[in-house]
């Protein structure tokens, strides 16, 4: 079945000379037709070091694509329902190292970045992340960057934002996703989203990627397919079945769902889901919803 994943941190792992769980072999075995690769630099390092890290990850991304027939990168073009290869897309997770320097944003777009979040969990010069109280939100510079994103058909990712920033993005941004999260209805964690936020994303024709991180799924270090299934069930019950998908966060999480240790395990998850949900729900969830969302906004350009 066509599978798509809206978030992984494999590039950081490769940049740190570690071997990623998301790689050519596991993508192939998992039937992954579409994989988003996030550019991320640890926020503790200096702005200069973060900029250098992002450059390094971009270079590594293009090297990987060049070296493998199985990875395709064609920014701003239509993505086919074909998982005999993987369409690799690029996003930026946290943009404190760019601030509102639009030359740098343009440069990133020219290198294939099509989606970006303003901040990680912290508060930076653009927005306030999920660790921050709601008296903080988007800054003037953050609003300017959203405007640039709208003008350049860049998707605004609200994963990691606090609620205040989220609602401001909903108001200002054209195309909004939460690339890797779970639901607060099932676990009240600052990285998860409320039913009200889900409804706003449905309204906006956005997208929600569900992570495999047990800490966000049930608050422990252990989760099973059934815990993941409960997230899906809840989202379907509040009318979000057409906008949900996978946002694994592989290579960015310290534990994962039992039986789902890397992309090669997707067929097992799919079989489990097919035994419990309608086929069209499963097809949407594991890939088609994200592919369609991505094509909708690419065509809009
Ligand atoms: Zn993240």
Name what the model sees in each region.
Residues 1-36:
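An N-terminally biased module of ancient metal coordination in phosphate/nucleic-acid-related enzymes
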Residues 261-301:
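Mid-to-C-terminal alpha-helical segments outside catalytic/metal-binding sites
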Residues 26-103, 130-136, 140-143, 147, ...:
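A metal-dependent hydrolase metal-coordination microenvironment
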Residues 2-5, 34, 87-91, 114-115, ...:
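Structural preference for beta-strand elements that scaffold enzyme active sites
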Residues 7-11, 40-42, 91-95, 121-123, ...:
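Active-site beta-loop-alpha junctions enriched in small/polar residues
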Residues 239-260:
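Short acidic/histidine-rich active-site segments
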Residues 7, 27, 112, 156, ...:
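Conserved, mostly hydrophobic/aromatic
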